[in-house]
Structure formats: C-alpha cells, structure tokens
C-alpha cells in the first residue's frame, strides 16, 4: 500500500538522519555513507509512489533501508534518537503511524537544537538537497525546509494540528521523557520540558 511505502521511505531517511545530524567528529567514512544513503532515499522515494512496480527503484530503496539501520553508519559517531523517543508517545496516545510521528517531530528537533546541528545541517542541505546558496546558517535553515517538503511530498503530515493534537495535549505527550528517565539528544540534555517546547513548535 502507498501509505506503507511512504512510511518506509520516511522512516528509513530519518534513521539515517538521527545517526548523522549531530556535530562534526571528522568521521568521514560514516558521513559519506550517510549522505549517500539520504540522497538515494530522497531521490528514489520521490519516484516510488508514481512507479510502485519499478523493480530498480524498489531495489535501491530496500538496500538503502537495510543500510540505514545495520549499525555501520553509527559506528564511532554521536547519535540523536530524540524524535524516535518522543514519537512513541504520539503513537501510544493518538495511534499515529511511527513514520508520521517522525515527520512531525524531526523538523522541530532540527529547529530547537539548531545551533548544535548547524554545521551538519548545512552540509546535509548541500549534498542531499543541492542547497548551495547563502551563508552556512541560511543553508542550514533551508535544509530544514527541504526535509519537511520531502515528507509532505511523500504524503505525510508535518504538524501536530493536522492530526488533531492541540497544546492541551502536550504535557501528557512530553511526560514519558522524564518518567522513563530519558535524557535525549546527542548531548543527553533534552528533558520533558524541552520535549514539550519542541512539540509546541510543531502545532
């Protein structure tokens, strides 16, 4: 089904992002692997919904998805799985598809933690989305817009309000972060207060 294909594309893309989009540690091999995977998933993902029976598109996506979470690209690099952890509450409390929660939350994490992620965001914008104009900060901000646009083109929503979730729901959605004792993000500093603020950016 198209919905599951879109979910798989977006989930695979974000698996790579969360192992890549932190801060530079001169891990050139892992960065190159991740950038190549994101580029392939982006390019082939945009084709697959219109060409669901194209074997080559499917094969490239399946191989990219396999490499998105087979631990290779995460070796020796900081990782940020905060979108995943926060997304669990959206699925548990509102029944949203896993990939749908990620498409909503990741742009919020990128925006909220912008200073920490600016260098890698700008690099991602250049090599994945072809963004070359502007300062590093401008390219980094354009990369966030490009990511959200990609998710929308895949047919996913990118705002909590589109899923019937309002500000009154945010306390309950953010509470599991502290309840589970999680300290999220590459710096292990995102608590429930910060999680709520990230979610508020996505209303």
Specify the residue positions occupied by each region the protein language model found.
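A short secondary-structure junction signal
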Residues: 2-3, 73, 193
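Short runs of predominantly hydrophobic/aromatic residues within well-ordered alpha helices
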Residues: 6-10, 58, 102, 170, ...
């Amino acid at each position: 089904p198209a919905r599951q294909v879109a979910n798989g594309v977006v989930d695979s893309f974000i698996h790579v992002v969360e192992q890549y989009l932190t801060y530079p540690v001169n891990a050139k091999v892992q960065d190159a692997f991740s950038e190549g995977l994101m580029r392939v998933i982006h390019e082939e993902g945009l084709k697959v919904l219109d060409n669901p029976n194209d074997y080559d598109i499917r094969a490239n996506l399946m191989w990219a998805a396999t490499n998105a979470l087979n631990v290779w690209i995460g070796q020796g690099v900081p990782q940020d799985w905060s979108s995943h952890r926060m997304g669990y509450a959206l699925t548990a409390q509102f029944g949203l598809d896993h990939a749908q929660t990620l498409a909503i939350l990741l742009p919020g994490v990128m925006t909220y933690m912008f200073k920490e992620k600016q260098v890698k965001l700008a690099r991602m914008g250049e090599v994945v989305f072809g963004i070359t104009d502007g300062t590093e900060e401008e390219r980094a901000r354009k990369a966030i817009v490009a990511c959200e646009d990609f998710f929308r083109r895949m047919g996913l929503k990118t705002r909590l309000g589109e899923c019937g979730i309002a500000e009154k729901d945010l306390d309950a959605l953010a509470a599991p972060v502290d309840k589970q004792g999680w300290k999220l993000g590459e710096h292990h500093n995102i608590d429930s207060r910060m999680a709520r603020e990230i979610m508020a950016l996505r209303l």
